[in-house]
């Protein structure tokens, strides 16, 4: 009996479990834990852009995935491979989410990699972009 081919969801289609996510139709994870899959981003904004994808859609798995991205970034800093990193998540179409399964973006940063490195304040057009702490 032939095995049933998984149905992968397209951008903006509801995803019921991580196995339906488009990431598995394109690639295999580069790392995996009990809670998280890690993929290279297919459309990276910089070299080293990774996606930390929780295996379940709940706060415990999402939190563990965030923690893994944070630890990964700190290891890269300690190794001298990067100077800093951004870790973030777009939740909901209005926030820029296209794959409707939670996933955390890890973006490595280097000194002077951007004229204006910005931060979260630059994400919203009506924000006060002059305020720095």
Go through each PLM region and give its residues:
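HIT superfamily nucleotide-processing domains
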Residues: 1-133
